[in-house]
């Protein structure tokens, strides 16, 4: 447990010290993705996730694989995420999309911070949100 607390504290302190770069996103579609950090846990034991085989016992991020039948980015690996709804913050969007896409429901106090918003060629301004899923 101490190692989990130490990793969470380290990630949170680094994010708090990070000077965010906020590009001009006027007129762009706003979106958020979520980077879920799990410390030395098996995915099968993370709160809310079904049992899976072959998970690493090291710190990990959760990725999704887009359906092969989609018109855009079919079959690609992606971070959970999506468009920011009216009145939502990037953090709220990240937690909502995580629950919708992966079935993992985390709480606002699991949010550790943000990374720089980046602009895509397809007209999106995407804000990465880092959250803590804890240990197995």
Can you name each region flagged by the protein language model?
Residues 1-78, 82-136:
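N-terminal leader/linker segments that precede catalytic domains of diphosphate-processing enzymes
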